[in-house]
Amino acid sequence: MTATLPAGLPAILPGHGLAGQVALVTGASRGLGRVIADALAGAGAAVGLVARSAGPLAQTADQLTAGGATAVAVTADVTDPRAVAAAVEQVSRRLGPIDVLINNAGAAGPYGALWEVDPGDWWQAIEANLRGTVACTQLVLPSMIARRHGRIVNITSQAGAYRWPLVSAYAVAKAAEIKLTENLAAELRHTGVTIFSAHPGLLPIGLSEQALTSRAPEDPATAKVFSWIRRELEQGHGADPDVAARFVLRLAAGDCDRLSGRHLTVHDNLDTLIAQADEISRHDLYTLRRAEL
């Protein structure tokens, strides 16, 4: 049902661990965010956890500390700039300056054709996916740049690189995040800070979980989207959450810095891409571009 581990993914190169570093993960109360937080803690990082749901977020923190990790949980809505600023300040004060930011918080948004969905719901999904990423990134960058050290991983989606009919808000937001990653990489060149767009694959947790566990929805658009998700996972086109977390961990750990600004996926062989980094840069690959004749 799930993809196997791609070659070149699991190992972090010597000297590129996260011991002594501070990582901040948004959307850390459940799903992929929780799995990523656990992977970061396992690599030696102290982890700041941010999410809206206080109860599940506390469970994530308890899980990490029970394993011997250092973790701080802060309840905050990433679409609220003041709440984000307070969360970043609290994590930095208690754990130290943030070295790694994982922008994972997001929402699928309304399902349906654009002219049929509620405009407010559509824009709310854009904010949940994009505004939080921008707010968190803006807040951690000054310290990273001053220290000439930092890595940011934006959890995006192939929906932003291609299309996802009936899920336009999510696809548009993810496309914006992919382009934000590319633009920031150019702005951050020579600062010591790198940034990546990371597609974790279609997972059986998080945004897909409702499709797997809910009864058949009455809304035709939602039913169609859920049916597609179930079919893709049943046909083995998904990814394992632990594999996805190790993919993100490798980007955060430093040995992929030559790929800064690129849109990468869990199915990529990172060792091969690192070896081809000069060619990738020369031909401007792994970015969003218009295909021409």
Report residues per predicted region.
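The beta1-alpha1 cofactor-binding region of Rossmann-like NAD(H)/NADP(H)-dependent oxidoreductases
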Residues: A54-G55, T75-A87, P119
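Active-site helix of classical SDR
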Residues: T137, A173-A176
